[in-house]
Amino acid sequence: METLKKLEEGRSRAEQILNQAYADVNRQHASLEETEFHRLKIQFDIIHFQAFSAMISILKAEPHTFARKVALKEILHMIYEYKGTVTQHHIWRLCQLGEYKGAYDTVTRLRELVRDFRDEFKSLDEYKTLRDKATGHYDQDISVQIAAIERIDEDAALAHALAFAEFQGRFAVLLREIGRATPGT
C-alpha cells in the first residue's frame, strides 16, 4: 500500500497546485500571452489532478475484476481525449508562446517530447470503441458497453497510464520553463 500512499500524497499536491492554477487563471494578466499560458496550465493541472484520482481508484479496486476494468476505462478515456487536445492544440500553442518568450531550447525539447511519445499516442487509438461505447458516450445497448469494458487488458491499460504519467512529468518541466521565461531574455 506504499504506492497508494504516494498517490494520495501526489493527489493532495496536485489539488493544491490546481487550486493555485485556478486563482492564477482568474487574476489580471499583463498580456494575452500570459493569460493564454495560464489557461493552458490549468488544463494540464486539471488532467494531472484527475490522473491521480483515477489511479487511486484503480489501485483500490480488486485486480482482475470488472470493477477494476471500470476504473481503468476512466483513465483510458481521459488519456484518449487529452492526447488529441494536447497534440493538436496545446503543444502547438506552447511552442508559439515559448518562441515568443525566447525559450527556444525548451520549444525544441517540447517537440522532441511529442516525437518520443508519438507511437504511444497512436496506440491509444485502439480505445476508440471503448470511448464511443462505454466512456462518456454510452451505447444504448448495455451489452455492448459491458463487452467493451471486458476487453480491457489490465496490463496494457496500466502501461498506458504509466506512459502517460511519464509524458505528464516531462511536460510539466517544459511547461514550467515556458511559464518562467520572459520575452527578450
Language-model features: where?
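Amphipathic alpha-helical interface segments
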Residues: 1-126, 146-185
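Long, charged low-complexity segments
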Residues: 129-136
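Carbohydrate-active enzymes and regulators
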Residues: 139
